């Protein structure tokens, strides 16, 4: 899937989304030394094509907070992909 990279999640059109979620990853495959925030549609359990790339975890969290929608961060569960840091709902 070709990704659309935005500066923050406040730039996203959420119309048509039922349960937007953001997942923060640390150094996922192909993106070294970065945090990547991927926007997911929680109602389908599938990622969208939207992502934000930042240098720090703090910047990743700020990019999510600018959405004005997701304000609850949940730490990675033991069964999650090791690259996942947090999920925001």
Which residues make up each language-model segment?
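Short N-terminal "domain-start" leader segments
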Residues: 1-36, 43, 65-69, 75
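Low-complexity, compositionally biased segments
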Residues: 16, 30, 52, 83-84
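Secondary-structure transition/turn motif
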Residues: 38-42, 88-89
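A short, exposed loop/beta-hairpin motif centered on an aromatic-Gly-Thr core
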Residues: 45-57
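Glycine-rich loops and low-complexity Gly/Arg-rich segments
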Residues: 47-49, 61-64, 76-78
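Short C-terminal domain-edge/linker segments immediately following a structured domain
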Residues: 55-58, 66-70
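Short, mixed-charge low-complexity intrinsically disordered segments
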Residues: 71-89
């Amino acid at each position: 899937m070709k990704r659309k990279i935005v500066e923050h999640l406040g730039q996203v059109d959420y119309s048509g989304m039922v349960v937007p979620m953001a997942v923060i990853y640390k150094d996922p495959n192909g993106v070294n030394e970065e945090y990547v925030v991927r926007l997911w549609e929680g109602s389908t359990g599938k990622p969208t094509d939207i992502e934000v790339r930042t240098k720090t975890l703090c910047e990743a969290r700020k990019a999510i907070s600018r959405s004005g929608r997701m304000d609850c961060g949940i730490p990675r569960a033991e069964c999650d992909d090791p690259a996942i840091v947090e999920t925001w709902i």
